Amino acid sequence: MALFEDIQAVIAEQLNVDAVQVTPEAEFVKDLGADSLDVVELIMALEEKFGVEIPDEQAEKIINVGDVVKYIEDNKLA
């Protein structure tokens, strides 16, 4: 569960929201108030923090926090 908490902290900081709002079901645009630029910057911050590359075609499929957690779990470098 530590991975979720790390991701949660990055998202909360990047989007300037309270960490309690960052739940697996929370959608970046609808629930967390992100715009398209916020999402791009968030993806870049997550790539840097977790050592993963999130291609544009994958990034377009990432709608909520749970999507990010699953992608990073599946692709994080050991």
From Swiss-Prot:
Domain Carrier: 1-76
GO cellular component terms given for this protein: cytosol; membrane
Transmembrane segments: none
Alphabetized SMART domains for the sequence: PKS_PP (SM00823)
UniProt PTM: 4'-phosphopantetheine is transferred from CoA to a specific serine of apo-ACP by AcpS. This modification is essential for activity because fatty acids are bound in thioester linkage to the sulfhydryl of the prosthetic group.
Modified residues (O-(pantetheine 4'-phosphoryl)serine): 36
Protein name as annotated: Acyl carrier protein
